[in-house]
Amino acid sequence: MLTAATELGYEGKIVCGLDAAPSFNTTYGGDCSNIYYINNINIDDPTTAEMAAAVEDKVSAVNKYFLGYDVVMIAKQCIEEAGLDDAAALLSAIENVKDFKGLTGTVTIDPETHMPDGMGMFMYTYDNQTPVMLEEFAG
């Protein structure tokens, strides 16, 4: 999208979702200063930064890795609580996840909507190719 916009002569700001988060900057290879994007992780958090450093050479999109990691760890916790023999008990465990401390934040599932409640998002831009957090939005 940035390549197409540049080729068309567009020089303004571009607001994106997770697809513009790193590794977009290194894949694109050019100045990304006009890109603004949301991310589900705070790359400045020490725990997140440590885990990101451990996996950045193994995965293409660290932020999406964190989401997947949290989903798997929530599933693990629910299976440990409810087992695999009773589908209703497992469903109840998933629907009632509360205060799970994950890499993307503290996750609580709303049993009525099945959506996570209270997860923050972070707005970033780039200084050339370096991510810069602008603001955290509480969930």
Question: What do the PLM-derived regions correspond to, one by one?
Answer:
Residues M1-G139:
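Extracytosolic ligand-binding ectodomains
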